[in-house]
Swiss-Prot record:
Homotetramer. Belongs to the aldehyde dehydrogenase family. IolA subfamily. PROSITE patterns: ALDEHYDE_DEHYDR_CYS. Catalyzes the oxidation of malonate semialdehyde (MSA) and methylmalonate semialdehyde (MMSA) into acetyl-CoA and propanoyl-CoA, respectively. Is involved in a myo-inositol catabolic pathway. Bicarbonate, and not CO2, is the end-product of the enzymatic reaction. Transmembrane segments: none annotated. This is Malonate-semialdehyde dehydrogenase. It comes from Bacillus cereus (strain ATCC 14579 / DSM 31 / CCUG 7414 / JCM 2152 / NBRC 15305 / NCIMB 9373 / NCTC 2599 / NRRL B-3711). SUPFAM superfamilies: ALDH-like. The lineage of its organism: Bacteria, Bacillati, Bacillota, Bacilli, Bacillales. Pathway: Polyol metabolism; myo-inositol degradation into acetyl-CoA; acetyl-CoA from myo-inositol: step 7/7. NAD(+) binds at residues 154, 178, 181-182, 231, 386. The active site is at residue 286.
Amino acid sequence: MITTEIKRVKNHINGEWVESTGTEVEAVPNPATGKIIAYVPLSPKEDVEKAVEAAKAAFETWSKVPVPNRSRNLYKYLQLLQENKDELAKIITLENGKTLTDATGEVQRGIEAVELATSTPNLMMGQALPNIASGIDGSIWRYPIGVVAGITPFNFPMMIPLWMFPLAIACGNTFVLKTSERTPLLAERLVELFYEAGFPKGVLNLVQGGKDVVNSILENKDIQAVSFVGSEPVARYVYETGTKHGKRVQALAGAKNHAIVMPDCNLEKTVQGVIGSAFASSGERCMACSVVAVVDEIADEFIDVLVAETKKLKVGDGFNEDNYVGPLIRESHKERVLGYINSGVADGATLLVDGRKINEEVGEGYFVGATIFDGVNQEMKIWQDEIFAPVLSIVRVKDLEEGIKLTNQSKFANGAVIYTSNGKHAQTFRDNIDAGMIGVNVNVPAPMAFFAFAGNKASFFGDLSTNGTDGVQFYTRKKVVTERWF
């Protein structure tokens, strides 16, 4: 339930809401107004240790619960999420800032991840081959690995946690969740509904906080695996630190997603697709389109239509259904983004749509409007870096080959899209682009939860990705059994 009271956020350990043992707190503002809506604890190491102890104790019994029974609990959780999806979307808009339309879409994608987790009995099945030698059978069995942890970002406070703990718990593990201190309220509600579904205490534990919680998770000897989603520098740190302490780690990192626009594209649908990918959720998503490589033959026409349509977008509070671009998450991030826009101008790019100039009526929130640069090249910071904002760079290329070459020069390789009506162009793009997730006339090629989600190069650190069969393999260990009976 959303109230006007300033909330003091708690941890959830061993089935109970508890105050952090630390004294440090951080204010949580509504990004659309700047007004404080909550205070979140910056929990110390001791809180993480208590959560791990609770999860470790719960694992002894939870791991022995029959797999179908674990799924039945998740079906109850799924039902509760569906019944409360309007409230969940409003909490996301309140603390994250994205429009209610975007938040509602996120809720649905989170629910889809839980739907995947309910199918765990099928996904966990092993393999068997009889008579591999005379009288000898071979088989592979999958078992839970123990206490696992998830560290999640602010930009998808529902979807990304639901990628992690439902699947891990369905596999028989217990979980310690550390969500972003910038969006703690949705995490609280997810945990409340989880225990309403009837799960035993200690199966899921929530520890709020910042870097101290992250380090405590990475160094704790009883945590067997860590799932992470966030920026590239932090993902690299999480992967290196976690593996150094003997853990499995999957760390999904940053992006600089390119879209190649071919002369044979459907112009109207391509423009709307690029706008949706670049500017929805205020560009604060790792699958946002941040660079368009447009072929010279169609460049002027495409850019004219894109600019005209982008200038129609309204900026403001996400609860106003007329607004398309909500606020950025914090004032500090807004200042960082403005710095990138200024650097693009200083480096000689042409600013076609200036997101610094927005209507004063939007108020005191952390707003930057949709921004478009033309004449961008690979030497500019606005091409190189993940800005994580509604800032789109346009690079003109002579043909598909040059567009692919440009895209592959980025240090990131998360997602990439081509807009074309030519099957050969699509095939060439698919086979030669370096990206983990590829779209052909699909604006945001984020796969459904039953497929793996991960990029390449500096967009992903690890071996097994999140979601799908990769997720099940990450959260389980296999035993290969060779047996003979006399």
